[in-house]
Amino acid sequence: MSDDLVKILVLGPSKSGKSTVTNFLAGTRDTPTKEYHETNPLRVLEVEIALDDTRRSGRQAAGLKKAVVQLWDVGGSSKHQAGWPAIASNADGIIYVFNPEVKGSEKELLLWYKNFALNQDELDDDNNFKMRVTDGHSLIFSHHSSLPEFAVGDNAIPPMPKQLQGIRALETSLDYQSDNFKEAFDALVEQIIASRLAAEENDLLQKEREAKDYPRLKR
């Protein structure tokens, strides 16, 4: 296999910079403008990411050179909530985006976490909603779309709600102080691919073991 498809959702409140982040990660940065355009209800952009063979070993490294990433930029309005389960289906990763200049906006990410990271149609053995997308396959972007006035320095990333504290959070911006979120995005894709290939390899090994045991069972 020469490539693989990865589906990553970009979620968060309206006017948080999701489309700007999506365009940048897809290699199509916007022309600077102060005019707001609502995403209604969804955009899907694709980008190819080169994969680092040195991060994989054995069968995992064979032939896989790139991943095709679909970035699903989901509108921040809840008026399309009825369609969210369909959007969430088969998601591999999530990027949560919020504006730290808006007080309490990080708490709004809980709505997106509960509706997309959790599968509310299935329960686990402890009677909790099953995880659709794990924390390790997610990122949080504290995104500055304009010159930061309040959220700077140690306050750039406010404390996350308890349910989101296991997700890596970064300070992001295209024009102001920012962590290297493109590098974090590439690493996220690598992690998703590595987890997928490890699961496929384990499944193949299990089938090989079962095939070896089958003649013994017949005797």
Curated annotation (Swiss-Prot):
Q: Name one GO cellular component term.
A: motile cilium
Q: What InterPro entries does the annotation carry?
A: P-loop_NTPase (IPR027417)
Taxonomically, which superkingdom?
A: Eukaryota
Disulphides: none
List, alphabetically, the Pfam families matched. Roc
Compartments where found = Cytoplasm, Cytoskeleton, Flagellum basal body; Cell projection, Cilium, Flagellum
Which terms in the Gene Ontology molecular function aspect does this entry carry? GTP binding; GTPase activity
The answer, when asked if Nucleotide-binding is one of the entry's keywords, is yes
User: Where would you say this protein principally sits, based on its record?
Assistant: cytoplasm
The positions annotated for binding GTP are: 12-19, 72-79
Q: Which UniProt keywords apply?
A: Cell projection, Cilium, Cytoplasm, Cytoskeleton, Flagellum, GTP-binding, Nucleotide-binding
Question: Which terms under GO biological process does the entry name?
Answer: cilium assembly; intracellular protein transport
Q: Does the keyword Transcription apply?
A: no
Q: What does this protein do?
A: Required for flagellum formation.
The record's comment on protein family reads:
Belongs to the small GTPase superfamily. Rab family.
Question: What name goes with this protein?
Answer: Intraflagellar transport protein 22
Q: Which organism's genome codes for this protein?
A: Trypanosoma brucei brucei (strain 927/4 GUTat10.1)
Q: What is the lineage of its organism?
A: Eukaryota, Discoba, Euglenozoa, Kinetoplastea, Metakinetoplastina
